[in-house]
């Protein structure tokens, strides 16, 4: 009986005080994203398992999925991230939207990860997607949105350090130093 009276490991209850804090957090995220011209979208929490197999063939995320076969005999998974969902949505209706597309979502995600302090198996995340503009200005806009979000929570330049880098440039540099294995390169970075 005690087991059914507790939330599952890695999941949590939101009592009114925690709910109020969560609503403040998500309300701030929405306000800032909208101030940058982003429009909110959402997708299903449950997706076909193949959507994640295609994106992460052999990747770590596949081992962290909450997946099962539903009553219709379909292999499905609770979404662990938003990128495959938004990609699927945009492919389905690509001609209906002018680029650049500036969308954001605030959604729950699920990963069956090893439990650690501060890492839950269900978590809420802000995603800001700027599609159809690969310019440095688009990258700068996303960084500005990030900074403004942190400022909205009271952080200042005394609290924030952003280091901009280019993984390809680092990989090229490491190759000149004799580091060609990707796993070694990631450790070096």
Predicted regions, residues:
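Extended, charged alpha-beta segments that form solvent-exposed binding/catalytic grooves
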Residues: 1-189
């Amino acid at each position: 009986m005690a087991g059914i009276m507790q939330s599952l490991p890695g999941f949590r209850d939101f009592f009114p005080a925690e709910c109020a804090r969560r609503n403040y957090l998500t309300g701030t995220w929405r306000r800032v994203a909208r101030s940058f011209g982003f429009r909110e979208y959402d997708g299903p929490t449950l997706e076909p398992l193949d959507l994640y197999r295609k994106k992460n063939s052999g990747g770590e995320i596949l081992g962290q999925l909450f997946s099962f076969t539903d009553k219709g005999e379909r292999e499905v998974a609770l979404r662990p991230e938003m990128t495959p969902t938004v990609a699927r949505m945009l492919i389905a209706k690509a001609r209906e939207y002018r680029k650049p597309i500036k969308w954001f979502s605030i959604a729950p995600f699920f990963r069956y990860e090893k439990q650690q302090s501060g890492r839950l198996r269900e978590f809420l995340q802000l995603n800001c997607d700027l599609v159809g503009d690969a310019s440095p200005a688009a990258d700068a806009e996303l960084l500005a949105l990030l900074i403004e979000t942190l400022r909205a929570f009271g952080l200042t330049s005394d609290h924030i350090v952003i280091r901009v880098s280019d993984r390809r440039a680092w990989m090229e540099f490491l190759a000149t130093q004799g580091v060609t294995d990707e796993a070694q390169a990631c450790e070096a970075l």
